From Swiss-Prot:
Expressed in petals and stamens. It holds the Pfam family SRF-TF. Residues 75-164 form a coiled coil. It comes from Arabidopsis thaliana. Changing residue 151 to M: In strain: cv. Kent. Mutations in AP3 cause transformation of petals into sepals and stamina into carpels. One of its GO terms (biological process) is positive regulation of transcription by RNA polymerase II. The lineage of its organism: Eukaryota, Viridiplantae, Streptophyta, Embryophyta, Tracheophyta. This is Floral homeotic protein APETALA 3. It comes from the Eukaryota. Keywords: Activator, Coiled coil, Developmental protein, Differentiation, DNA-binding, Flowering, Nucleus, Transcription, Transcription regulation.
Length: 232
């Protein structure tokens, strides 16, 4: 029984389509290689799958560029002409844009104004005024920030100065430094400035021989003070 003719149409199943593509691609490359070996032909095949994956075959001892150049020479068709024209058009547009920008910069510097009519001059004037307004607003904002920063610094310095003055006033009223309580054991230290730059620490030491009869406390006396040399 003769085999029925296979209908050529798109394979809907993606997996089957990919398998068929791989098999037929390998078969095509095999035939191209046979043509190269058997017939001394130069063959170049460029293929893209449905997922845009590139596959290509090129005969040994040649390149794709050589094949394309040979095709252009024999067929008298410039493959790169269209691409070159596009590149030239892009270059022309970029040069035109560059010239316009240079002209606008010069006009904002007061140059190239003779070629402008009254409407263009008014439009340029409005643009410059808006620019000046934005610059002034930014300048005032920057100055305001600097003023606020300076005020905060001055306030901090004033607070430090007030604290120092307050401390000096306290020391002027009482040359002794503050008595430090030492957890209820009555051993305390006084800072005392005497004899120029010499500093001494005076420590009260509990003396059990001095006793307050009414309160059950020992009273400090001269013998309870111990002097330690601190600085010289």
């Amino acid at each position: 029984m003769a085999r029925g003719k296979i209908q050529i149409k798109r394979i809907e199943n993606q997996t089957n389509r990919q398998v068929t593509y791989s098999k037929r691609r390998n078969g095509l490359f095999k035939k191209a290689h046979e043509l190269t070996v058997l017939c001394d032909a130069r063959v170049s095949i460029i293929m893209f799958s449905s997922s845009n994956k590139l596959h290509e075959y090129i005969s040994p001892n040649t390149t794709t560029k050589e094949i394309v150049d040979l095709y252009q020479t024999i067929s008298d068709v410039d493959v790169w002409a269209t691409q070159y024209e596009r590149m030239q058009e892009t270059k022309r547009k970029l040069l035109e844009t560059n010239r316009n920008l240079r002209t606008q910069i010069k006009q904002r510097l007061g140059e190239c104004l003779d070629e402008l009519d009254i409407q263009e001059l008014r439009r340029l004037e409005d643009e410059m005024e808006n620019t000046f307004k934005l610059v002034r607003e930014r300048k005032f904002k920057s100055l305001g920030n600097q003023i606020e920063t300076t005020k905060k610094k001055n306030k901090s310095q004033q607070d430090i100065q007030k604290n120092l003055i307050h401390e000096l006033e306290l020391r002027a009223e009482d040359p002794h430094y503050g008595l430090v309580d030492n957890g209820g054991d009555y051993d305390s230290v006084l800072g005392y400035q005497i004899e120029g730059s010499r500093a001494y620490a005076l420590r009260f030491h509990q003396n059990h021989h001095h006793y307050y009869p009414n309160h059950g406390l020992h009273a400090p006396s001269a013998s309870d003070i111990i002097t330690f040399h601190l600085l010289e």
